[in-house]
Amino acid sequence: MLKAFKAAILALLVGVAMLVTGVSAAQAEAPPSSDPDASLLQRQATSPEQLQEQVDLQLRLYPGGKQINDHEVAYDDGKFVITFAQPGRQLLASPDCPSGWFCFYDYANYGYPRGKLSDCGWQDLSAYGWHDRTSSVHNRTSTSVDYDNHTVGGHENDQYMFSNYSGGALNLSSTQTNKADHVYRYC
């Protein structure tokens, strides 16, 4: 009885903390997927059918998003958007982040899939399945963006990795690649 009471109190406190901080259940930290098909999200589709499989898998593994066209999924009313490479699309070699957004790419040289955000403040990329998936970045906002690595335990152990300044585009070093878990945009 006491155990159940403690669990109920803890759940209530977590719910209140999420309401106070504005963090939705979809934004609560999600563990990396153990689904064997998850690698499909990180490679280029070879057909329109496989592209739809990627979109469907993204939505199954990381619920709360909405397909907005044949190759994009949006979360939190469009605050975070994942763009999958369309079949036949070549590696970019130059960044293509839209104005007003900051983007992070799964591959070096701005290779898709691409995630993009425009909100200010702290964002947890794991809520969208984008933790440990950044190899290049492009910032088209008017402010800088910090990237952090969540190592172990609570967020007090997060490690600052680098800043991406307004207008900046860069390929990450081998010590930074596929480690970003959180971003902070200064506004």
Stretch-by-stretch model annotation:
Residues 1-30:
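Secretory targeting and sorting signals
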Residues 29-187:
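Compact beta-sheet-dominated domain cores in extracellular/mature segments
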